[in-house]
Amino acid sequence: FEYGEKELIYLKQKDKRLAEVIDQVGMIERTVDDDLFSSVVHHIVGQQISTKAQATIWQRMKDYLGTVDADTILNAGVEHLQPLGISFRKAEYITDFAEKVKDGSFDIEGIWKKSDEEAIEELSSLKGIGVWTAEMILLFCMQRPNVLSFGDLAIQRGMRMIYHHRKIDRKLFEKYRRRLSPYCSVASLYFWAAAGGAVPGLKDHAPKSGADCKKKAAEQVEKVTAS
C-alpha cells in the first residue's frame, strides 16, 4: 500500500497519540492486489477459514486455473472448484460473480470510477461480499486513501489501546474518522499494528467480559496483515 511522508506528517500533526505509534512502528509495507476480479475471489475464498488455509487454497486455484479471471472460473465451474478445497457455497458465489462480470451486469471497470460509498455498496451487493470485505478491497486492491472500517474488530482494538477507551462506539469512531481524514487508510495500518502487539506497553482497555471480542480482533489482525 503506497504512502509516504506527506500522509505521516499530516496524521502526526493531527493526533499526538497516533504520532507516538507511527514513530515506534515506522513505515509499514503491505502488498496489494490491483486486479479487482482476483481480489474479490481471493476474499471470498478466505472467509471463515484460517489465513494458512486461504493461502493453500488460493495457490491451488492459481495452479489449476493459471489465471484467475471470469473465463477460467466459468470454464472450471462449481464442480471443478470444489475439489480445490472451496465449499459449495463459496464456489457458487465465485461463479455467480464471474457470470455477472462476463454478462456485464456487474461493471467491474466502472467500480474504479465510483466514490468510496458507491463502490462499497456495489461490491457488497455481490453474493459472499459484505461491507467489511468491500472495505478491505477498497484498501488493499483499489488503494483508496480514506478507508477506516467500523466493523473491523482489530481496528476497534487498536483504537482502544492507543486512545485508552473501554469501548469504541459509532460516535467516538466518527470523531477519529473526521480527525484522520483524508488519510484514514494509513491510520488503519497503524491501528492494526497496535492491535497486533507492535507497540510495547499498550494494552486493550476493553472490559474483561470482552475476551471473545479480543480473540476475534486478534484473528482479524492476522487475516488483514497476511492478505
Predicted features along the sequence, with ranges:
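A general alpha-helix detector
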Residues: 39-44, 76-80, 118-122, 136, ...
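Alpha-helical ds-nucleic-acid-binding substructure associated with the helix-hairpin-helix region
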Residues: 17-21, 49-50, 54-125, 179-181
